[in-house]
């Protein structure tokens, strides 16, 4: 069965059954998926009695209860394959089609020159910091907080969206991978879901004050341009705990929170996760 969605919240359950020719017995496995089948989307799944599951031949962490999660990056292909093996060694395959998104063009002026074309003397620092951030996002713990509804981490105006192609002072740069929430410096930032602090640095070159939380199975969330960090690496954070304060550190033109969600190396759209929360309240 081919699954295709127009990017909206999708919830489906399919029963995959195989008649056993050698006997009159009958075995079946139910696959449940919830999330957004679109670029930038996060999808949670559940399979009972499965011993392994993979997406495009990449193994996914599987909880004792059969929970797993995966996501799609900004420019990922639109066709994917989910495979799994049950406890009896039977293999299954599920094609998945996702929608392609169009992204806005975001032209930003007034950015300090040192952040548009950094001087050579800071190149080693930038590379070192990028490696540290990537390492923090490689965490693949057994936590299951990614199953919980996601709350908005700060009050304020949405000033930037996921996926937009950015131009700084007229020069093209990498797309934006977060959701920007503008508010005054010192405004509180709260944990949108529970997790563990895996990265907390007050002064990175591009992102300024930077915080990363682990939510399990390769899902992390990132908070940047912070003026103050209230937590440290190793802290266990409950949903709604104050973790930081909005700032204007790093490459910015004004105070705001740049909030990001990640599945391993893929950047996901936080706005879609908040849509899920709103849908659950209806």
Where are these regions (language model features)?
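Zn2+-dependent peptidoglycan hydrolase active-site motif and core
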Residues: 192-227, 255-261
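Surface-exposed, glycine-biased beta-strand/turn segments
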Residues: 95-207
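Extended, charge-rich intrinsically disordered regulatory tails
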Residues: 235-253, 259-282
């Amino acid at each position: 069965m081919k699954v295709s969605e127009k990017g909206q919240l999708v919830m489906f359950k399919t029963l995959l059954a195989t008649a056993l020719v050698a006997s009159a017995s009958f075995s079946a496995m139910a696959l449940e998926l919830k999330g957004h089948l679109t670029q930038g989307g996060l999808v949670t799944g559940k399979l009972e009695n499965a011993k392994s599951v993979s997406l495009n031949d990449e193994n996914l962490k599987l909880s004792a209860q059969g929970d797993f999660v995966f996501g799609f990056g900004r420019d990922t292909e639109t066709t994917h394959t989910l495979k799994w093996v049950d406890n009896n060694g039977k293999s299954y395959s599920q094609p998945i089609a996702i929608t392609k998104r169009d992204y806005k063009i975001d032209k930003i002026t007034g950015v300090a020159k040192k952040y548009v074309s950094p001087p050579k003397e800071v190149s080693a620092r930038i590379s070192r910091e990028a490696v540290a951030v990537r390492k923090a996002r490689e965490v693949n713990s057994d936590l299951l907080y990614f199953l919980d509804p996601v709350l908005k981490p700060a009050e304020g105006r949405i000033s930037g969206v996921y996926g937009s192609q950015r131009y700084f002072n007229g020069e093209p740069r990498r797309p934006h991978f977060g959701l920007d929430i503008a508010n005054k410096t010192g405004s509180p930032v709260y944990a949108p879901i529970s997790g563990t602090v895996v990265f907390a640095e007050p002064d990175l070159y591009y992102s300024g004050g930077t915080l990363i939380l682990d939510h399990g199975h390769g899902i992390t969330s990132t908070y940047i341009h912070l003026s103050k960090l209230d937590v440290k690496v190793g802290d266990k954070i409950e949903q709604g705990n104050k973790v930081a304060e909005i700032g204007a550190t790093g490459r910015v033109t004004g105070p705001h929170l740049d909030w990001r969600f990640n599945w391993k190396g893929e950047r996901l759209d936080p706005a879609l996760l908040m849509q899920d929360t709103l849908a659950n309240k209806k």
